[in-house]
Amino acid sequence: MSANSFKLLVKNATQLVLVCRNGEKYLTRDEMQALAVLENASVLIGHDGLIKAVGPADVIETQFEGAKFDNVLDASGMCVLPGLVDAHTHPVWAGDRVHEFAMKLAGATYMEVHEAGGGIHFTVAHTRSASEQHLLAALKSRLERMMRAGTTLVECKSGYGLELDIEVKMLRVINSARKSLPIGISATYCGAHAVPKGKTMEEATKDIVAVQLPKIKHLSASGDLQVDNIDVFCEKGVFDLTSTRCILQAGKDMGLNINFHGDELHPMNSAHLGAELGALAISHLEEVTDDGIVAMAKSKTSAVLLPTTAYILRLTPPRARDMLDAGVIVALGSDFNPNAYCFSMPMVMHLACVMMKMSMPEALAASTINAAYALNRSQTHGSLEVGKQGDLVIINAPRWEHLVYQFGGHQELIRYVIIKGDFVYENDKVLNL
């Protein structure tokens, strides 16, 4: 391939949102308010799928005069943003829980639904009986919908098996999707999502540490699986702090990043535990303490906040402002699962602004570079900088903020989604403002 030949030139964008200026791996405090944005700019992607140049349109045109491009897109009147990163999802399951929505609207709490045989255990029963082919088809459909909403990198958890064979089945499904779809995937083993029926917490912990994790390590070493992270639901009535520590440490010892559910329904001191263990990320944190926030800021453990959860369960939202002001690396995720059925990171950003008092720049940073950091991918994803993967979202609007501002409007705003310089979604139904 000629050194003067490139896969894609996107030129003349009204706004090109780089997010980062100097290769930052995450943004905190005032950095999140001052995102790097170029006016009338272009971005160039090579045949290897990586960004080769970004800058003012006239400078790029002059610098690459005579170059050949497989595709040229004139983005006049449009805005270009980095592909969005969804840092927390549960997308592999069978059996929706639409019937439980009525229970919640009538006042049932999450744990009341759980104790009545609903919630996670309902989904576990259906997922155990579903074929691998059924689960893969459903996962592919869900990931396609996420891509159409601008997500180009997503964390995908297991956790609706709670026994070795089904957890491995779910991880195989995630691995198959990784190989067959363009969207980037970070795979998380979440066998400690709940205590299986008929077992105690102690028995479940022993099974995970002595049986499940060694098998997953073996399958990963042989190339049959690719698992990146380990997760535990650290919660009253689920896995306590001692069991959580045991499972997370075992996962860390086999090379997995710690990325777990903590301080969601009760203050469990999960934030302290995560900071102590060197966790990459802790999700939820609705009940985090002041000391926990300080500990996370010091340890550079990212807080993956999930406004959809507080919204659907009518919980007090996470204290995003306190975390931001303390210097915590704040990221966002959709928490897509049968309980919180949301594919859309633009809607998550809007909810984060309204419910958690984040600004629009903070929400975008939390859905790009900081979410990538939570998945240990901020060296390759989360901003539009030379050397990073060429993942773009292009919207039909004069300012990038419309992607956050127009609640539920992303389907008419997003014109193109691009991954590694390839068009993975082209929307001919965009409407002018």
Swiss-Prot record:
User: Which catalytic reaction applies to this protein?
Assistant: 4-imidazolone-5-propanoate + H2O = N-formimidoyl-L-glutamate
What Enzyme Commission number does this protein have? 3.5.2.7
What CDD domains does the database record attribute to this sequence?
Answer: Imidazolone-5PH
UniProt KW keywords:
Histidine metabolism, Hydrolase, Iron, Metal-binding, Zinc
Quick one: which residues bind 4-imidazolone-5-propanoate? Answer: Y160, H193, E264
A Pfam family this chain is assigned to? Amidohydro_1
Please list the cofactors this protein needs: Zn(2+); Fe(3+)
Q: Where does Zn(2+) bind?
A: H261, D335
Q: Name one GO molecular function term.
A: imidazolonepropionase activity
Which positions bind Fe(3+)? H261, D335
Tell me which family the UniProt entry assigns to this protein.
Belongs to the metallo-dependent hydrolases superfamily. HutI family.
Q: In which pathway does it act?
A: Amino-acid degradation; L-histidine degradation into L-glutamate; N-formimidoyl-L-glutamate from L-histidine: step 3/3
| Biological process according to GO | L-histidine catabolic process; L-histidine catabolic process to glutamate and formamide; L-histidine catabolic process to glutamate and formate
Organism for this UniProt entry:
Danio rerio
Cellular component annotations (GO), alphabetically ordered: cytoplasm
Official protein name in the record:
Probable imidazolonepropionase
